[in-house]
């Protein structure tokens, strides 16, 4: 191992303070379920009292969904070398349908473990994996179909509600616009039974591998909060284990609900182990990437046996969902020939090349039922990959894209026959007028299995700003029914993202997802908006910053022009100044009404006009006066 690698592993002993410090005026709160080991984290944002001039009332705290795990809990000591605390082992043990294996069973996993040169690089506390007992199915879908509400399902119901009843009682939801959900069935409150029903129906998934016990359970489905995914991963051009773990902790701080490890460089197995042991959110992968590395990058040399071993290797580590491009069929490949941008999916191009080289059907398709057997033994969810997604708006909604989508619908039904959880990946590049057709087609072909899209990007003219071009499409398709949005950073099409790019991409997609939740009418979605709007009107600047998705940036922008502490209580900002602030003027109108005993603000405004008119006449009706 090089000196650089050793230094990187040593750095893993420490955590970037930026990723671990609590948010301003916030604290981690745990909501307890029906048993003491169901402890659901939410972030409580404390608010200042309304100033006396505005009524002087107390403002209740606002609770927001928290993906940051133990990292922002000052009561938890984080040691990346040991991994995060165990959340789920007891629940899994109680079900009595799994067994601890004597060791790793994949050939590649065993070979890596036996390689002494990797000792200083690997995660030191690798747990012995578990697997379903012979003949057992350990998927959350299997339990749901049997009518069982698991602790994971109860945990999720509490998490999705975020103290909704208390918020209603406190008046935080006195104003919420009705949504338009395009046929989604969103209840006024999420219950454990509703979670079970949605998972049993296949409309939602709980990605939760039995070997990822550090996981804080979450759900992906159109009748729940819209989720976002962030991507990390090394490449042949660089990055280290330390950098990838840092990207993970940074991404979940800002709101990534799941993270995909798309590593294609060195030490993929070891990097993934460090990520999983330190991740409170589901981790997804594209197993064909690692399988390709095992054959030195030659797609034609891939075999079912190599891929199968890769699935088992990653399932035993704890990967929660696999992107598998089983819908790239030989007959669809010629349909991409006249495209502007051809096949842009890495996984799709790998499988297309294999199909053409052997002139055989995609082995992921022909071995799909065998893949299902592996998935249900570890409760790994399918993310059925869209290997033929459009890479330009010119190619959107073509025969290749929709042909593959129809095949993904067929595969969904096969997976459901095995009680394996499924979500469907979607585009890509789609102009705004074609986005709803994508969503409607997916709901029809895939029987409402959750949709998971990359954007889509709505135009191709903005390299460097594709987080915006895609954020527009993401908000739209999230409203139409997409369950999870894969973030796009400003570096899309240009290079590997750094920490700042990751944050920008996640914040952009949190905005898109939240806008979709508002539009769908998700219960409680407007609580944060109402609280921030009230703080804005009352010039509670610190509360405005702290209620935002990115308090640091909001505070920094304000302080660029008004850096003094006194500006944090001023009744204006640098945009309009003290004399032209619309909210200050509105408050003055209200004060005038109160002083003059007028109950209607419009009457107060009219009275003010009359007063000024009388003054104009008294002063001689002169338009211009010498001053």
UniProtKB/Swiss-Prot annotation:
Keyword set includes Cell cycle: no
Positions of substrate binding: 231, 260, 289, 325, 345-347, 386-389, 425, 452
A single MF term (Gene Ontology): 4 iron, 4 sulfur cluster binding
Listed GO biological process terms: thiamine biosynthetic process; thiamine diphosphate biosynthetic process
Substrates-to-products reaction catalysed: 5-amino-1-(5-phospho-beta-D-ribosyl)imidazole + S-adenosyl-L-methionine = 4-amino-2-methyl-5-(phosphooxymethyl)pyrimidine + CO + 5'-deoxyadenosine + formate + L-methionine + 3 H(+)
Residues binding [4Fe-4S] cluster: 573, 576, 581
Keywords annotated in UniProt: 4Fe-4S, Iron, Iron-sulfur, Lyase, Metal-binding, S-adenosyl-L-methionine, Thiamine biosynthesis, Zinc
Note on how the cofactor is bound: Binds 1 [4Fe-4S] cluster per subunit. The cluster is coordinated with 3 cysteines and an exchangeable S-adenosyl-L-methionine.
Source organism, top-level taxon: Bacteria
Family of the protein in this entry: Belongs to the ThiC family.
Biological role: Catalyzes the synthesis of the hydroxymethylpyrimidine phosphate (HMP-P) moiety of thiamine from aminoimidazole ribotide (AIR) in a radical S-adenosyl-L-methionine (SAM)-dependent reaction.
Protein name per its UniProtKB record: Phosphomethylpyrimidine synthase
Organism of derivation: Pseudomonas paraeruginosa (strain DSM 24068 / PA7) (Pseudomonas aeruginosa (strain PA7))
Gene: thiC
């Amino acid at each position: 191992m090089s000196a650089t690698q050793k230094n990187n592993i040593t750095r893993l002993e420490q955590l970037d303070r930026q990723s671990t410090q609590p948010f301003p005026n916030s604290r981690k709160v745990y909501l307890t379920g029906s048993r003491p080991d169901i402890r659901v984290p939410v972030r409580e944002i404390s608010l200042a009292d309304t100033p006396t001039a505005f009524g002087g009332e107390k403002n209740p705290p606002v609770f927001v969904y928290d993906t940051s795990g133990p990292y922002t809990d000052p009561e938890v000591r984080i040691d990346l070398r040991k991994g995060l605390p165990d959340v789920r082992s007891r629940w899994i043990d109680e079900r009595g349908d799994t067994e601890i294996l004597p060791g790793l069973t994949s050939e590649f996993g065993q070979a890596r473990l036996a390689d002494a040169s990797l000792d200083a690089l690997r995660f030191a506390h690798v747990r012995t994996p578990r697997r379903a007992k012979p003949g057992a199915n350990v998927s959350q879908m299997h339990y749901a179909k049997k009518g069982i509400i698991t602790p994971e399902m109860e945990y999720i119901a509490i998490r999705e509600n975020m103290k909704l009843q208390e918020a209603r009682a406190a008046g935080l939801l006195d104003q919420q616009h009705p949504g338009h959900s395009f046929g989604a069935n969103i209840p006024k409150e999420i219950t454990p039974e509703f979670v079970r029903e949605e998972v049993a129906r296949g409309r939602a998934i709980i990605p939760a591998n039995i070997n990822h016990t550090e996981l804080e359970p979450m759900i992906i489905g159109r009748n729940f909060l819209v989720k976002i995914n962030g991507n990390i991963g090394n490449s042949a051009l660089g990055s280290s284990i330390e950098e990838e773990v840092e990207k993970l902790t940074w991404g979940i701080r800002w709101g990534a609900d799941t993270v995909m490890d798309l590593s294609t460089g060195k030490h993929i197995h070891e990097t993934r182990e460090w990520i999983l042991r330190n991740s409170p959110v589901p981790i997804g992968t594209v197993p064909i990437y690692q399988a390709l590395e095992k054959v030195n990058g030659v797609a034609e040399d891939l075999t079912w046996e190599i891929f199968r071993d890769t699935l088992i290797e990653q399932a035993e580590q704890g990967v929660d969902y696999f992107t598998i491009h089983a819908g790239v069929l030989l007959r669809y490949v010629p349909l991409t020939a006249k495209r502007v941008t051809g096949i842009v999916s890495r996984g799709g191009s790998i499988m297309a090349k294999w199909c053409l080289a052997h002139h055989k059907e995609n082995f992921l398709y022909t071995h799909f039922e065998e893949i299902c057997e592996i998935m249900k033994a570890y409760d790994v969810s399918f993310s059925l990959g869209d290997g033929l997604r459009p890479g330009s708006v010119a190619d959107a909604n073509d025969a290749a894209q929709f042909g593959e989508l129809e095949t993904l619908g067929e595969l969904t039904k096969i997976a459901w026959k095995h009680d394996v959880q499924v979500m469907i990946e979607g585009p890509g590049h789609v102009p705004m007028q074609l986005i709803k057709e994508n969503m409607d087609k997916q709901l029809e072909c895939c029987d409402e299995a959750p949709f998971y899209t990359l954007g889509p990007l709505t135009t191709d003219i903005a390299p460097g700003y594709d987080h915006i071009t895609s954020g527009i499409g993401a908000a739209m398709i999230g409203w139409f029914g997409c369950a999870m949005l894969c973030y796009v950073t400003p570096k899309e099409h240009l290079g590997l993202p750094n920490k700042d790019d990751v944050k920008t991409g996640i914040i952009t997609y949190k905005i898109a997802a939240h806008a979709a939740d508002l539009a769908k009418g998700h219960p409680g979605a407007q609580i944060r908006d109402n609280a921030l709007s009230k703080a804005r009107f009352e010039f509670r600047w610190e509360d405005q910053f702290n209620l935002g998705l990115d308090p640091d940036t909001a505070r920094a922008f304000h302080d660029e022009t008004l850096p003094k502490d006194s500006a944090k209580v001023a009744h204006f900002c640098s945009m309009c100044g003290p004399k032209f602030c619309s909210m200050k003027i509105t408050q003055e109108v209200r004060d005038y009404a109160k002083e003059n005993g007028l109950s209607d603000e419009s009457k107060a405004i009219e009275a003010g006009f009359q007063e000024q008119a009388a003054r104009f006449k008294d002063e001689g009706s002169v338009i211009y006066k010498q001053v």
